[in-house]
């Protein structure tokens, strides 16, 4: 499978209305989801758009394949920005659970491969958050696996 131009990928697009003060427009395509809690997923950001403010509740690795991914770390207690970084094509990172941040596609968007590992319980992957840090929704392996059957 060529991740850069596979026409068989099933993309799910997420856009939001006026509920957020930043433009949300991204798509994801699940490559593999396994019973052992491993998920491989491609995420594509539209130019200068965000995904939801979120906290990773699973171990995660990512590789930027195209474009730039702008990451802003946030202190969940105060809501203050802790720092910003720009990840470019070829950048790889591995993080333990607990990382809280915003992600935004650069001027030409971004395409990123994520590998998540959540082996326990329902397999909590990511919590989408409101600006105040309260949880809007939780993504789980259990729900993903159920939808794929």
Language-model segments: residues:
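A short hydrophobic beta-strand segment most commonly corresponding to one strand
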Residues: 94, 107-126
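A short, N-terminal "cap"/entry segment at the start of jelly-roll beta-barrel domains
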Residues: 1-37, 81-85, 128-149
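Glycine- and acidic-residue-biased ligand/ion/polar-headgroup-sensing regions
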Residues: 56-78
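Conserved hydrophobic/aromatic beta-strand scaffold that supports enzyme active sites
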Residues: 28-30, 40-44, 61, 84, ...
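Solvent-exposed residues in well-ordered beta-strands and their adjoining turns
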Residues: 46-48, 70, 117
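Short acidic-glycine-tyrosine-enriched beta hairpin
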Residues: 75-106
């Amino acid at each position: 499978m060529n991740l850069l131009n596979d026409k068989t990928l099933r993309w799910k697009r997420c856009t939001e209305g006026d509920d957020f003060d930043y433009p949300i427009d991204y798509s994801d395509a699940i490559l593999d989801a396994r019973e052992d809690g491993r998920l491989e997923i491609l995420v594509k950001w539209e130019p200068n758009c965000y995904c939801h403010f979120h906290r990773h509740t699973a171990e995660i690795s990512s590789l930027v394949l195209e474009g730039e991914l702008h990451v802003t770390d946030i202190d969940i207690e105060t809501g203050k920005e802790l720092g910003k970084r720009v990840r470019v094509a070829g950048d790889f990172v591995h993080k333990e659970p607990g990382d809280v941040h915003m992600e935004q596609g650069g001027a030409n968007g971004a395409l990123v491969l994520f590998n998540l590992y959540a082996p326990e319980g329902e397999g909590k992957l990511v919590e989408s958050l409101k600006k105040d840090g309260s949880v809007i929704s939780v993504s789980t392996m259990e729900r993903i696996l159920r939808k794929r059957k």
